[in-house]
From Swiss-Prot:
The encoding gene: fliW
Main location class: cytoplasm
Chain ranges passing through the membrane: none
SUPFAM superfamilies, A to Z: BH3618-like
Species, as recorded: Desulfovibrio desulfuricans (strain ATCC 27774 / DSM 6949 / MB)
Protein name, as recorded: Flagellar assembly factor FliW
């Protein structure tokens, strides 16, 4: 049985040992970080809805992300994707991928944390390829987390198949 290759990287959370097989490649990079192509998802705490999408090459580049379906019904947010994006991700439907959104927490104002719905990050967990898919909709661009009730408490939402985190 083959063992996963562990590698050491410096992160925003300190030095971490990560599974090299869980690295996600972003062929186009991310908005503002176009030259950063390889990332890994790191748990902040077990069972916490927030993760760090950490650059493999730059310890300063780590984005706070969340599964939006932990905070809202799946029917309330469906990012639009074109055929080119689906082809690049090697999926035929959004249901085959994990959807993450960046989280903004203003300094000193954790109660004003917001989910950024305008630039979802879509990851094909099986192929380990990801893409940020900017949205051009008239819908809300962000939703403040204090106005949301975690979906897990109501048990009504379908959870997306989140990409495994380290």
């Amino acid at each position: 049985m083959a063992r996963n290759k562990e590698i050491e990287i410096d992160t925003r959370l300190g030095r971490r040992s990560v599974d090299a097989d869980k690295v996600v490649h972003f062929p186009r990079g991310l908005a503002g970080f176009e030259n950063e192509r390889d990332f890994i998802l790191l748990q902040i705490r077990p069972e916490a809805p927030l993760l760090i999408l950490q650059s493999m090459s730059n310890p300063v580049v780590g984005l706070l992300v969340a599964d939006p379906y932990s905070f809202m019904e799946k029917s309330a947010y469906a990012p639009a994707m074109g055929e080119a994006e689906k082809q690049l991700l090697r999926i035929s439907d959004l249901d085959e991928a994990a959807v993450l959104v960046t989280v903004t927490i203003p300094a000193g104002q954790p109660g004003e944390a917001a989910l950024n719905l305008a630039g979802p990050i879509v990851i094909n967990s099986r192929e380990r390829v990801g893409l940020q898919v900017p949205q051009c909709s008239d819908g809300p661009q962000q939703i403040y987390m204090h106005s949301l009730k975690p979906v897990g408490e109501s048990g009504q939402a379908e959870k997306s198949e989140a990409a495994p985190a380290e």
